[in-house]
Amino acid sequence: MDLLADCPTRLAFDLVANTWNPVVVWALRHGPRRHGELRRTIGGISAKVLTETVRRLEFDGLVERREGAYALTPLGETLLEPIEGFGRWAAEHGDDVVAAQNRVRPA
């Protein structure tokens, strides 16, 4: 797997590296949602950040706006399985990561 700056794999990592991209994609997995409903579903995201995120996802071809609601495109739907995999990994290893972050570091 090549992870150079201009490789396709790096592009995929960039799509899920943004804090809100995978959250918004996951929140749309059951179908279209209006901006306010999407914001309530997610929680903890400002209206401005949500707007910026859905616009970026639209630009990337992952989300489209139809009749005032945001929905995943077929391309966006292909991200659901990898996002679910990250969620499983976090559930299994999240405590280990937190423990590592809380270790006392040598001076």
Residue ranges and their predicted role:
Residues 64-69, 103-107:
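Noncatalytic linker/hinge segments flanking ATPase motor cores
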Residues 65-87:
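Basic, amphipathic "hinge/linker" alpha-helix immediately C-terminal to the N-terminal HTH DNA-binding motif
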Residues 81-107:
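Amphipathic alpha-helical dimerization/coiled-coil segments
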Residues 54-55:
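Short, hydrophobic-biased segments on the C-terminal half of alpha helices
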Residues 1-2, 9, 75, 91, ...:
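Proteins with a high burden of low-complexity, intrinsically disordered sequence enriched in S/T/G/P/A and R
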Residues 2-49, 60-62, 71, 77:
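N-terminal helix-turn-helix DNA-binding core of bacterial DNA-binding proteins
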